[in-house]
């Protein structure tokens, strides 16, 4: 099974990544976003550069700069490798997954009423749940004779 480039990139979101550019610079930061041009957004980014030795010196040094949030143009990227796993947020509040039980402060859709009643597989539920089926005959309200039109006026008063 082949995995598209887009899925590979999505799998590495929030990972600590090391990006090498054409000019030899290296950016290390947390991979936050990308687009169709493979422009990369890195958070808490550091730039590492190799310093060429001056005439007469034998050792070359490395210069490190802390940059913060950086947008790297995809055209200049040579390689991109995983430098570390995504950071763990133990201090943050755990949020319920989508479809979990709602609570105070959580937006949940209203739904479509009561869940389906258990019954035979593939068969519709038998009837309305208790309390939602309507009034029962003979319980409460006037009798059928009182509901017929032309029964008379209001009790104890003259018509308007």
Curated annotation (Swiss-Prot):
Keywords, comma-separated and alphabetical: Cytoplasm, mRNA processing, mRNA splicing, Nucleus, Ribonucleoprotein, RNA-binding, Spliceosome
Subcellular location: Nucleus; Cytoplasm, Cytosol
Main location: nucleus
Name of protein: Probable small nuclear ribonucleoprotein-associated protein B
A Gene Ontology biological process term: mRNA splicing, via spliceosome
Function: Plays a role in pre-mRNA splicing as a core component of the spliceosomal U1, U2, U4 and U5 small nuclear ribonucleoproteins (snRNPs), the building blocks of the spliceosome.
One GO CC term on file: U2 snRNP
Record's compositionally biased regions (Gly residues): 99-113, 128-143, 150-160
Keyword GTP-binding (UniProt): no
Family: Belongs to the snRNP SmB/SmN family.
Cited PANTHER family: SMALL NUCLEAR RIBONUCLEOPROTEIN-ASSOCIATED PROTEIN B (PTHR10701:SF0), SMALL NUCLEAR RIBONUCLEOPROTEIN-ASSOCIATED PROTEIN B AND N (PTHR10701)
Gene3D superfamilies hit by this protein: 2.30.30.100
Gene name, Swiss-Prot/TrEMBL: snr-2
InterPro entries found in the cross-reference section: LSM_dom_sf, Sm, Sm_dom_euk/arc, snRNP_SmB/NAA38-like
A GO term, aspect molecular function: snRNP binding
Cited CDD domains: Sm_B (cd01717)
Location of the Sm domain: 4-86
Domain of life: Eukaryota
């Amino acid at each position: 099974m082949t995995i598209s480039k887009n899925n590979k990139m999505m799998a590495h979101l929030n990972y600590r990544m090391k990006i090498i550019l054409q000019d030899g610079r290296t950016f290390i930061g947390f991979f936050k976003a990308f687009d169709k041009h493979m422009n990369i957004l890195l958070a808490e980014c550091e730039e590492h550069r190799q310093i060429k030795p001056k005439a007469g010196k034998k050792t070359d040094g490395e210069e490190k700069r802390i940059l913060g949030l950086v947008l790297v143009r995809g055209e200049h990227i040579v390689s991109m490798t995983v430098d570390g796993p995504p950071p763990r947020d133990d201090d943050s509040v755990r949020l319920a997954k989508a479809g979990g039980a709602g609570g105070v402060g959580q937006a949940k859709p209203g739904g479509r009423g009561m869940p389906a009643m258990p019954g035979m597989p593939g068969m519709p539920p038998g009837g309305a749940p208790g309390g939602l089926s309507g009034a029962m005959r003979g319980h409460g309200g006037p009798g059928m004779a009182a509901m017929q039109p032309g029964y008379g006026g209001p009790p104890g008063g003259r018509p308007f």
